[in-house]
């Protein structure tokens, strides 16, 4: 599906080598201050063009088509479009009938009977432009409530930071070309990416996300738990293979006496749960880790088949990220923002008092 969210609905459209990529955000309340400069800055973070990302250079200039008037949201659908300006479709002519390993080529073809071979079409990470735009709009709402979502990279390949989560340096990550959270490892991270690129290969990454200023009560019970929604959103990002919340996998190795977050004087003494209990936020920081596989587009010789079942060897052309997880950190951040904004709006009608307050009733 191309639409995400319950109360705040986000729909993306467009393909890697199509005319444009964009999104529609429906359900945003009227009166939210709309910051176009912030929107553009978020899109600029996701852009390629550096030696650590795809050489494909796009201006990624956002055009807001509707839903905003005199600097504020109107309560109507917000449409944002970003035109593709630098697609090299000829690079993919030799892939028209070929299935690239670890891509969506094989599954898209057998599911739909047709696929856009130019850069992967809809399955391309180019679609994430729309997600980042939507996440930026969601952040404008979250900002009104003091909720701040920050993300960065804490692992590249076999190099993983051993810093404690509270020691991750988000200010450094803002200035880092690869959004590195550990200043001491930035050089190793960069070398790992460049070594992969120089050997016609790629490498995976690990992304850390922290949400501060959280409110109590976001999320629902059972099938719409906040952790379920976050995992759903993040697992829908290109190349993501695993998501952890709080202690994550480590919780399976712990005793309950260590994993439980005790309370004293109205405060939690720890945050092993990652800010979520029973599927509902408890007011502590949300803690998430997202793991990206190596970019499947590599330039080493590979084996595959074509749509006729013929075996063949091929070497890929085109422009691709040596580590998709670097720019993926910006996308992961956007998806968390969209989930939280949606939950924030849903919580406004979670009980009678909330509903009465919305109408000024007691």
From Swiss-Prot:
Output the Gene Ontology terms for molecular function: chorismate synthase activity; FMN binding
Q: Name one GO cellular component term.
A: cytosol
Record bears the keyword Flavoprotein: yes
User: Which catalysed reactions does the entry list for this protein?
Assistant: 5-O-(1-carboxyvinyl)-3-phosphoshikimate = chorismate + phosphate
Question: Which keywords does this chain's UniProt record carry?
Answer: Amino-acid biosynthesis, Aromatic amino acid biosynthesis, FAD, Flavoprotein, FMN, Lyase, NADP
Cofactor, free-text remark: Reduced FMN (FMNH(2)).
Cited SUPFAM superfamilies: Chorismate synthase, AroC
InterPro entries per record: Chorismate_synth, Chorismate_synth_AroC_sf, Chorismate_synthase_CS
Q: What's a GO biological-process term for it? A: aromatic amino acid family biosynthetic process
Q: In which pathway does it act?
A: Metabolic intermediate biosynthesis; chorismate biosynthesis; chorismate from D-erythrose 4-phosphate and phosphoenolpyruvate: step 7/7
Instruction: Share what the entry says about its subunit structure, partners included.
Output: Homotetramer.
Instruction: Explain the purpose of this protein.
Output: This reaction introduces a second double bond into the aromatic ring system.
What PANTHER family does the record point to? CHORISMATE SYNTHASE (PTHR21085:SF0)
Protein name stated in the entry: Chorismate synthase
